[in-house]
Amino acid sequence: MDTQAFRRSLHHSDRYNRRGFDSPTKRAQALEEAYQSDLISSIRDNGFTYTKGRLNIKLAQAFGFCWGVERAVAMAYETRRHYPNENIWITNEIIHNPSVNDHLRKMNVKFISAKNGIKDFSLVSNGDVVILPAFGATVQEMKLLHEKGCHIIDTTCPWVSKVWHTVEKHKKHVFTSIIHGKFKHEETLATSSFAGKYLVVLDLEEANYVSEYILGRGNRNEFMNKFAKACSNGFDPDKDLERVGVANQTTMLKSETEEIGKVFERTMLKKFGPENLNSHFLAFNTICDATEERQDAMFSLVDEDLDILVVIGGFNSSNTTHLQEIAITKNISSFHIDTPERISVKENSIFHKPLGSELELKNNFLPSGKINVGITSGASTPDKVVADVIEKLIDIAS
C-alpha cells in the first residue's frame, strides 16, 4: 500500500478530523479544570521544592502531561461533547493512564476489544465515531475504519507522525527501517505499519547483535529466531540489512536511541567505507522534545541528595519506565506507582512495581526523621495525581 497516498486521501475526507472541536483557549481551560493542581503550581513557583515538617519534596523540573498528551485527552473529551448521542469507540487506551481511561469509559466511550493481540472491529458500524489514540493506529486500522464509513478523530501525537514520515522516507529510498522500540507497543506497531522492510531492536544489546550480523559474525537461524516477531514479513537479514535507516518509538531512552544510531553508522562505515556511507545509512532525528526534557530533568533530579524517589505513571507506560531506569542507575531507592491509591497512609506502605518485576508491597517505606523525597511522573500523568501522592506522603510524615 502507498501509505503516503492513503494518508493524504484520508486527511481530505470530511469524515476525518485531527484538529478537534474546541478553541485552544477553551481546550486549555477544560484541561486546567480537570487535571491541574494549585499545590503543584505553587511548588513549581517555589523552585520545584516543598517542605512540610520533616518532609522535603523535590520535583523534577519537567514532568507530567506533555503537549501531545494534553492535545489527545482534550480532543477525546471534545469528541463526546460534539457527538453526545453517537456510538464512540477508541482503538486503544488514549494514553497510558488509568484514571484518564476510566474517565472516558464513564463518558460511554467504548474501547475496541482485542484477543491474542488482534482487535475486533466487528461491532463498529457505518457512522460510528472512532478515536485514534495519542500513540496512533496502524495504517491497516485506519483503512478499515475509513472503508466502514466511520468518523475518525485522530489524536495521534505530531511527534509520532514525524516518525511515520521518517520510515516512509526509508521505504521510498529502499532502506530498511531499524526501529528502536518495543515491538508490541502500540506506537511501534503503528510506526512499523508505515514502513517497508523493518526490524525492531529493544536496546543497545540487540543493536550490537544486529551490528555483528551485518559484519558477518552471526548465525542466520539464530537471528531469525531472535527477531521472529520483531521484523517485517519476508525479512531477509542477508539482503535487508545492506541499507538501513534508524527511527524510534518516541518514548524510548534518548541516550540509548542516540547510541543505537551511532552503532549502525559505525557499522555501515566499517563495512562499506566513508565514500559509500550515505548510500547505506540514513541519519535521523525523531527524538521527542517532551521525552528528552523529562529524561534530562530526571538525570538532574537523581543528582540531588535524595533518600527515596517516587515515579508516577502507568505500569505499561514506556516513558515512565525509562524514568525509573534512570533512578536505578544511581542506586536510589525508587518506587514506581500508577495511582495514589498504591500508598497506604495508615500502614506507611506502598504497593509498587520494581523494574521488570511484578507488583510488590513495601512496608514502612517512608523512613523516620528528616527525609528528602524526589518525585517525577510520566507524560501521561495529570498534576492532580502527583498532588494526591504528595498529600499522602505529607500525611504519613506527620
From Swiss-Prot:
It is an enzyme of class 1 (oxidoreductase). Binds 1 [4Fe-4S] cluster per subunit. It catalyses: isopentenyl diphosphate + 2 oxidized [2Fe-2S]-[ferredoxin] + H2O = (2E)-4-hydroxy-3-methylbut-2-enyl diphosphate + 2 reduced [2Fe-2S]-[ferredoxin] + 2 H(+); dimethylallyl diphosphate + 2 oxidized [2Fe-2S]-[ferredoxin] + H2O = (2E)-4-hydroxy-3-methylbut-2-enyl diphosphate + 2 reduced [2Fe-2S]-[ferredoxin] + 2 H(+). One of its GO terms (molecular function) is 4-hydroxy-3-methylbut-2-enyl diphosphate reductase activity. It comes from Prochlorococcus marinus (strain MIT 9301). Pathway: Isoprenoid biosynthesis; dimethylallyl diphosphate biosynthesis; dimethylallyl diphosphate from (2E)-4-hydroxy-3-methylbutenyl diphosphate: step 1/1; Isoprenoid biosynthesis; isopentenyl diphosphate biosynthesis via DXP pathway; isopentenyl diphosphate from 1-deoxy-D-xylulose 5-phosphate: step 6/6. This is 4-hydroxy-3-methylbut-2-enyl diphosphate reductase. Belongs to the IspH family. The active site is at 187 (proton donor).
